[in-house]
């Protein structure tokens, strides 16, 4: 259970970081 929760948290963090990068790139344009 803990491993699954940790994996989900890491996946969500990576997704948020990717979305932030994309938004930043769009802002530059």
Curated annotation (Swiss-Prot):
UniProt keyword terms in alphabetical order: Chloroplast, Electron transport, Membrane, Photosynthesis, Plastid, Thylakoid, Transmembrane, Transmembrane helix, Transport
UniProt entry tagged with the keyword NADP: no
Localization terms from the record: Plastid, Chloroplast thylakoid membrane
Membrane association type: Single-pass membrane protein
TM stretches of this protein: 3-23
Biological process terms in GO annotation: photosynthesis
GO cellular component, one term: chloroplast thylakoid membrane
Main location, first listed in the record: plastid
Family under the similarity heading: Belongs to the PetL family.
Function according to Swiss-Prot or TrEMBL: Component of the cytochrome b6-f complex, which mediates electron transfer between photosystem II (PSII) and photosystem I (PSI), cyclic electron flow around PSI, and state transitions. PetL is important for photoautotrophic growth as well as for electron transfer efficiency and stability of the cytochrome b6-f complex.
Subunit structure: The 4 large subunits of the cytochrome b6-f complex are cytochrome b6, subunit IV (17 kDa polypeptide, PetD), cytochrome f and the Rieske protein, while the 4 small subunits are PetG, PetL, PetM and PetN. The complex functions as a dimer.
Protein's recorded name: Cytochrome b6-f complex subunit 6
């Amino acid at each position: 259970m803990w491993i699954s929760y940790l994996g989900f948290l890491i996946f969500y963090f990576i997704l948020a970081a990717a979305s932030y990068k994309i938004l930043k790139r769009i802002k530059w344009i």
